A protein has these predicted regions:
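Short acidic/histidine-centered micro-motifs embedded in hydrophobic/aromatic stretches
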Residues: 348-351, 363, 393-396, 406-411, ...
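Short, charged low-complexity linear segments at domain edges
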Residues: 378-419
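Accessory DNA-binding and partner-docking regions appended to nucleic-acid-acting proteins
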Residues: 1-9, 356, 367-372, 384, ...
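Short helix-to-turn junction characteristic of helix-turn-helix DNA-binding domains
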Residues: 33, 236, 291, 394, ...
Length: 659
């Protein structure tokens, strides 16, 4: 791409979005698209994927189609682009037939630069006819088709949607093939290859910016259901001034936890919302809008909430239950800290979570109805594989960040996350320093004898049992089930009587995770021998585990790590003295007033970072105003006078007070 084209891209970025430079990876994606090349961008949530197709769409003649899976994303992106001075549109089922006709009519007239559409609509006859007309000679032109959440096309991913398989057919039906750009935040190498093949990308420029979100703290704690509810309540109270999301695996849990939190937090003024697929469309839309508009501080939701929610100031995401995969967890947790400021991601789990997940897997998914028997069986097996990786995350005593980075194939970042101090080795490394495992003191314990006992017992049993029953037998339990099945006669019964059932069960889990034992699929998995079972009989066999030395000390260190990150951010970004803090709150109030009047989210007017920039620079002219990062020419023209007047009034008041 020519230097002049690159400068035009930077000018477009500044005019519409208020930035003077692209983030890492954005420039390469924009360059590839403007050079006429297909592109695949794998960029973490908050890295600015939308900029990669919005900037070219604002530069290229014609209309860019953006394929998006959710109505909320279409509507929010359209509002944000309108606020920035662009000409976007969307076409989905929330519009009446008359409104859809109007949108298509205006599109034919060349009034729009972008159009957001759902994958299900692409082959709908009326839309397809419009798209083919636009892409034909003499039409308005279709220079680019951008595909968001592209991992949905892959059956290897955690969120396969059959409608995404229509995208390639749609593109191939156009008279002139457009540039095709696909974007995702979560994709292993296998999923990336699937995306390229299923979408028909031609020699794409592939940009993988890495998966490490350094501003996020990751915590993982095992606890009972009652302890979870108390933990969430206490955490939300301690962070009452912040926006957060609490994810639950079922609608029932969402309703129960949201009700409990609302009752407990109501007196403190913290508003709690709930969101799941069992609610009506209007109720979900209203709740989502209230959260985006900062009228609700805490959203308790199933995974039906969040995809496409572009709310930058979410300070924490708590998973009250285990998600179905590492991909799902990374994507949902990644909704925290999109503004780049420190944020926290906490996973609370117990064995019941995995039993529920296995039940949900066996029950099947609505998307499975479009699959044949062979595909359905494969999908079931794949979901169990993904859940197994999630179980490994919960049980690891290593760095949580490293576990996820290695899962996604980001080896360089994983090595960096656990890099040793100068002069040390990898074994000496203290890890990333920003996850609960790295901030926990562990003791290494040799449990070779226990491991041998467990594997040998499983090897002698012709009938397979679950972890709990095996642990009971090895402990020497006197339960009715053990007596009825005569398991108290087994060789190995009571051989680990000095250990607790929970301890034995944990060792069995570790043996499964390392391949000495293995669990079957299904809601009630049983334990069998793993591929490495024979190794336990080797004289050199050794099996060690790590045990937490002090949970209390670990929790204190974890809190301190997040506090340090936030203190660093405050030094650079937040109002530092009393009058700056007062001005910040006044500008927030003005932003809320403007956004309410214009029916848009507050961050679509100016972001929190932009408000902090206004507090520091206190601009008095338009030229000074557009020096604030995140305030472009379009927004300066739309909102600048009101904010500069508020700053001038504030300074006048303080000048009088100081006189």
């Amino acid at each position: 791409m020519t230097d002049s084209m690159q400068q035009m891209a930077l000018d477009t970025l500044g005019a519409y979005f208020g930035y003077t430079s692209f983030r890492p990876g954005q420039d390469r994606m924009v360059d590839a698209i403007l050079a006429g090349r297909d592109a695949l961008g794998v960029m973490p949530t908050g890295a600015g994927k939308s900029i990669c197709y919005q900037v070219p769409a604002l530069m290229l003649p014609g209309i860019t189609f953006v394929v998006s899976p959710l109505l909320s994303l279409m509507e929010d992106q359209t509002r944000a682009l309108l606020a920035a001075g662009a000409r976007p549109s969307y076409l989905n089922s929330s519009l009446t037939p008359a409104q859809q006709n109007t949108v298509l009519k205006r599109a034919r007239e060349g009034r729009y630069q972008l159009m957001y559409v759902a994958p299900e609509r692409l082959l709908e006859p009326r839309f397809l006819a419009f798209a083919q007309e636009a892409a034909a000679d003499g039409g308005i032109g279709v220079p680019l088709v951008a595909i968001d959440e592209a991992h949905c096309v892959s059956q290897w991913g955690q969120d396969f949607r059959p409608a995404y398989l229509q995208i390639r057919e749609f593109i191939e039906s156009l008279p002139q093939r457009p540039i095709v750009a696909a974007f995702t935040a979560t994709a292993t190498e296998r999923v990336r290859a699937d995306i390229q093949q299923m979408l028909g990308l031609q020699n794409p420029a592939t940009v993988v910016t890495g998966f490490d979100r350094k501003n996020l703290y990751f915590g993982c704690e095992e606890m009972g259901d009652k302890a979870k509810a108390a933990w969430v309540r206490d955490y939300v109270i301690a962070h009452s001034g912040e926006s957060g999301i609490v994810y639950c695996s079922t609608r029932k849990t969402v309703d129960a936890l949201a009700g409990e939190l609302a009752e407990a937090l109501g007196p403190s003024g913290i508003r709690v919302g709930r969101y799941h697929a069992g609610m009506g469309n209007d109720a979900r839309r209203q709740t989502q809008r209230a959260f985006i508009d900062d009228d609700i501080q805490v959203m308790v939701a199933t995974n039906a909430f969040g995809m496409g929610i572009d709310k930058p100031n979410v300070r924490y995401v708590i998973h009250n239950n285990v998600p179905e995969s590492i991909e799902a967890y990374y994507q949902e947790a990644g909704r925290a800290g999109r503004d780049g400021d420190p944020a926290s991601c906490h996973l609370l789990w117990n064995g019941n979570d995995f039993r529920m997940r296995r039940f949900l897997i066996d029950r099947g998914d609505a998307a499975d109805e479009a699959l044949d028997d062979e595909q359905r069986a494969w999908a079931l097996q794949n979901r169990y594989r993904l859940l197994s990786q999630m179980e490994g995350y919960c049980n690891t005593t290593g760095c949580l960040r490293e576990y996820m980075l290695r899962y996604f194939g980001d080896e360089a970042a994983a090595e960096h996350a656990v890099a040793a101090a100068a002069g040390g080795t990898a074994d000496d490394a203290e890890g990333c320093g920003n996850c609960s495992n790295c901030l926990t003191q562990f003791e290494v314990e040799d449990v070779t004898d226990m491991a041998r006992v467990a594997v040998r017992y499983v090897a002698t049993r012709p009938m397979r049992f679950g972890k709990s029953l095996i642990a009971d037998v090895l402990h020497g339990g006197n339960t009715e089930r053990i007596r009825q099945m005569h398991l108290d006669q087994d060789r190995g019964y009571g051989e680990l009587s000095s250990e607790s059932v929970g301890r034995i069960k944990d060792i069995i889990g570790q043996l499964c995770g390392r391949g000495y034992l293995a669990t079957s699929q299904g809601q009630y998995p049983v334990v069998g021998l793993g591929p490495r079972a024979a190794e336990v009989e080797d004289e050199a066999f050794a099996f060690t585990v790590k045990r937490r030395a002090s949970k209390r000390k670990a929790s204190a260190r974890a809190r301190r790590a997040v506090d340090l990150l936030r203190e660093e951010a405050e030094l650079d970004q937040r109002p530092r003295v009393g009058d700056d803090a007062e001005l910040f709150e006044r500008l927030r109030a003005l932003r809320k007033e403007i956004s309410t009047e214009l029916e848009m989210a507050p961050y679509m007017v100016f972001s929190d970072k932009a408000l902090r920039g206004l507090c520091r620079l206190r601009p008095q002219t338009r030229d000074e105003l557009i020096q604030v990062n995140g305030i472009g020419e379009k927004k300066a023209d739309a909102f600048g006078e009101q904010f500069m007047s508020a700053i001038e009034e504030f300074e006048s008041e303080h000048a009088r007070d100081g006189a």
